[in-house]
């Protein structure tokens, strides 16, 4: 099939367009298209074919295109030449709805490195090397500050948030975790309890889906699970949380809390943890291992040998996939954790970063997309169907990116060694 308005082109390529979404299926017709065509012209071609098949979509919908899992960012001729592909063979080009580019929204400047970030509604929770955690809104207004740790805050997580109160957890280099309550609309914060049990730095923390348990991982090689219930009882041990910290009620007391469960098995420090299912946690760190644990019986179900130190992991909310960032020239590896024979399956790799991948976060609304942050100062937005190049590379940081978050679909948030929180806003595409 040759489109009429393309007959003026002197060089034609045989192209088969294949839709990844049935909504946009054009039946895979074989087309003769000008080699000069790029994404804009191919999008127009798809619209023409859809209209010919009586499929109505808004004119504003644009498409991305990929050949052999590599995003097309050049003309067809440029791509074919750069990859030494035959111009005599049929070239299969897959297409899918284009992701709108993230728009810069705001920069929040801090006094020290930002080690962790988590967004919730219109709020950002961040932990810093200055020993504090803070909550800001997206406009950069500081809502609350949490002081009490004796060293860096390495990890933060929201436990709950309603119109009146928010509960958070912080994990610190001082070997402790603290649960805090913030009275929304005020600067009032209270340390509810201090979790003690680790003997070295607590590097990361996460919360289960029901918000009843916390999991922490540490340089002491241990995994500890704690209850989020900090109810005070008559026999609870209490102590001042900070000599200089007072509220309207006077010096606050915090409950000392011990872990419910301790899991051992890693042979070196642990840097990353996620809790994708109610009875399953996944941990990773310096022993080159990703470990999957059954929290109900407290056993290590399976291991993935990455052969590199793992700095960050994320899990797809939609499918059995684990993405891991490690100490090897910026490669992100995606694994299927289901064991086949005696091994897990390496599904694919994402390659574009030029340094250590420090943090990852999967989209909560799109099973194909995730974001990554790296010591190369960039944040990248990926579609795993096109693993050879990111959809977008965001270059707002001036030093290492240490944390990324995509908990809220409309905001991509990152923190780094440049003392900055960068906020990017997304247009959430309407998809079928």
UniProtKB/Swiss-Prot annotation:
<dbReference type="InterPro" id="IPR012972">
    <property type="entry name" value="NLE"/>
</dbReference>
<dbReference type="InterPro" id="IPR020472">
    <property type="entry name" value="G-protein_beta_WD-40_rep"/>
</dbReference>
<feature type="repeat" description="WD 1">
    <location>
        <begin position="109"/>
        <end position="146"/>
    </location>
</feature>
<dbReference type="InterPro" id="IPR028599">
    <property type="entry name" value="WDR12/Ytm1"/>
</dbReference>
<feature type="repeat" description="WD 2">
    <location>
        <begin position="148"/>
        <end position="190"/>
    </location>
</feature>
<keyword id="KW-0853">WD repeat</keyword>
<keyword id="KW-0698">rRNA processing</keyword>
<protein>
    <recommendedName>
        <fullName>Ribosome biogenesis protein WDR12 homolog</fullName>
    </recommendedName>
</protein>
<dbReference type="InterPro" id="IPR015943">
    <property type="entry name" value="WD40/YVTN_repeat-like_dom_sf"/>
</dbReference>
<feature type="repeat" description="WD 5">
    <location>
        <begin position="305"/>
        <end position="345"/>
    </location>
</feature>
<dbReference type="Pfam" id="PF08154">
    <property type="entry name" value="NLE"/>
</dbReference>
<dbReference type="GO" id="GO:0005654">
    <property type="term" value="C:nucleoplasm"/>
</dbReference>
<feature type="repeat" description="WD 7">
    <location>
        <begin position="396"/>
        <end position="432"/>
    </location>
</feature>
<dbReference type="GO" id="GO:0005730">
    <property type="term" value="C:nucleolus"/>
</dbReference>
<comment type="similarity">
    <text>Belongs to the WD repeat WDR12/YTM1 family.</text>
</comment>
<dbReference type="InterPro" id="IPR019775">
    <property type="entry name" value="WD40_repeat_CS"/>
</dbReference>
<dbReference type="Pfam" id="PF00400">
    <property type="entry name" value="WD40"/>
</dbReference>
<dbReference type="GO" id="GO:0043021">
    <property type="term" value="F:ribonucleoprotein complex binding"/>
</dbReference>
<feature type="repeat" description="WD 3">
    <location>
        <begin position="197"/>
        <end position="236"/>
    </location>
</feature>
<feature type="region of interest" description="Ubiquitin-like (UBL) domain">
    <location>
        <begin position="13"/>
        <end position="97"/>
    </location>
</feature>
<keyword id="KW-0677">Repeat</keyword>
<feature type="repeat" description="WD 6">
    <location>
        <begin position="352"/>
        <end position="392"/>
    </location>
</feature>
<dbReference type="GO" id="GO:0000466">
    <property type="term" value="P:maturation of 5.8S rRNA from tricistronic rRNA transcript (SSU-rRNA, 5.8S rRNA, LSU-rRNA)"/>
</dbReference>
<dbReference type="GO" id="GO:0000463">
    <property type="term" value="P:maturation of LSU-rRNA from tricistronic rRNA transcript (SSU-rRNA, 5.8S rRNA, LSU-rRNA)"/>
</dbReference>
<dbReference type="InterPro" id="IPR036322">
    <property type="entry name" value="WD40_repeat_dom_sf"/>
</dbReference>
<keyword id="KW-0690">Ribosome biogenesis</keyword>
<dbReference type="InterPro" id="IPR001680">
    <property type="entry name" value="WD40_rpt"/>
</dbReference>
<feature type="repeat" description="WD 4">
    <location>
        <begin position="265"/>
        <end position="303"/>
    </location>
</feature>
<keyword id="KW-0539">Nucleus</keyword>
<comment type="function">
    <text>Required for maturation of ribosomal RNAs and formation of the large ribosomal subunit.</text>
</comment>
<dbReference type="GO" id="GO:0030687">
    <property type="term" value="C:preribosome, large subunit precursor"/>
</dbReference>
């Amino acid at each position: 099939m040759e489109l009429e308005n393309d007959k003026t082109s002197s060089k034609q390529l045989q192209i088969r367009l294949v839709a990844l979404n049935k909504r946009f299926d054009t039946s895979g017709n074989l087309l003769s298209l000008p080699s000069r065509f790029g994404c804009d012209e191919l999008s127009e071609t798809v619209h023409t074919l859809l209209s010919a098949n009586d499929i109505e979509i808004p004119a504003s919908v644009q498409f991305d295109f990929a050949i052999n899992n590599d995003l097309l960012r050049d003309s067809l001729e440029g791509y074919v030449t750069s990859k030494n592909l035959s111009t005599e063979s049929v070239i299969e080009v897959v297409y899918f709805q284009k992701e709108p580019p993230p728009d810069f929204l705001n920069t929040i400047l801090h006094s020290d490195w930002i080690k962790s970030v988590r967004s919730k509604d219109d709020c950002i929770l961040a932990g810093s090397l200055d020993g504090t955690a803070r909550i800001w809104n997206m406009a950069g207004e500081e809502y609350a500050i949490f002081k009490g740790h004796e060293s860096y805050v390495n990890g933060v997580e929201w436990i709950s948030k309603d119109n009146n109160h928010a509960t958070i957890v912080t994990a610190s280099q001082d070997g402790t975790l603290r649960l805090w309550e913030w009275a929304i609309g005020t600067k009032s914060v209270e340390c509810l309890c201090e979790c003690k049990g680790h003997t070295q730095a607590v590097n990361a923390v996460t919360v289960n889906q029901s918000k009843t348990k916390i999991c922490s991982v540490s340089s002491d090689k241990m995994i500890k699970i704690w209850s989020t219930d900090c109810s005070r009882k008559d026999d609870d041990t209490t102590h001042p949380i900070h000599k200089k910290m007072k509220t309207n009620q006077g010096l606050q007391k915090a409950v000392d809390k011990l872990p419910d469960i301790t899991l051992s098995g890693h042979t070196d420090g642990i840097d990353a943890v996620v809790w994708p299912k109610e009875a399953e946690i996944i941990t990773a760190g310096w022993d080159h291992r990703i470990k999957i644990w059954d929290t109900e019986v407290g056993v290590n179900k399976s291991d993935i040998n990455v052969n590199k130190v793992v700095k960050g992991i994320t899990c797809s909310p939609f499918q059995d996939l684990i993405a891991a960032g490690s100490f090897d020239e910026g490669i992100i590896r995606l694994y299927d954790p289901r064991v086949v024979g005696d091994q897990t399956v390496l599904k694919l790799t994402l390659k574009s970063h030029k340094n250590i991948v420090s943090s990852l976060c999967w989209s909560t609304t799109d099973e194909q997309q995730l974001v990554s942050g790296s010591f190369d100062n960039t944040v990248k937005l990926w579609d795993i169907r096109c693993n050879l190049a990111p959809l977008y590379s965001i270059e707002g940081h001036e030093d290492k990116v240490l944390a990324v978050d995509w908990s809220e679909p409309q905001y991509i948030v990152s923190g780094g060694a440049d003392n900055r929180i960068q906020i990017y806003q997304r247009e959430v595409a309407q998809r079928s």
